[in-house]
Amino acid sequence: SEIPQPSLDFEQFSNMIQCTIPPGEECLAY
């Protein structure tokens, strides 16, 4: 399993997950 973004921090990942549940188009815009 290769990681596309090794610099992906858990904070960003957690933020993306939380922004994926609600209509977080602005969140995914980063």
Swiss-Prot record:
This protein's GO cellular component annotations are: extracellular region
Tissue specificity statement from the Swiss-Prot or TrEMBL entry: Expressed by the venom gland.
Q: Which domain of life is it from?
A: Eukaryota
Post-translational modification, as annotated: Glycosylated.
Family, according to the entry, reads as follows: Belongs to the phospholipase A2 family. Group I subfamily. D49 sub-subfamily.
Q: Which UniProt keywords apply?
A: Disulfide bond, Glycoprotein, Secreted
Q: What is its main location?
A: secreted
Q: What does this protein do?
A: Heterotrimer: Snake venom phospholipase A2 (PLA2) heterotrimer that acts as a potent presynaptic neurotoxin by blocking synaptic transmission and synaptic vesicle recycling. Enzymatic activity is essential for the neurotoxic effects. May act by binding in a calcium-dependent fashion to neurotonal pentraxin-1 (NPTX1) and neurotonal pentraxin-2 (NPTX2), but not to neuronal pentraxin receptor (NPTXR). Also binds to taipoxin-associated calcium binding protein 49 (RCN2), a protein localized in the lumen of endoplasmic reticulum.
The subunit field of the Swiss-Prot or TrEMBL record says:
Heterotrimer of alpha, beta, and gamma chains; non-covalently linked.
Name the UniProt record assigns to this protein = Acidic phospholipase A2 homolog cannitoxin gamma chain
Location in the cell: Secreted
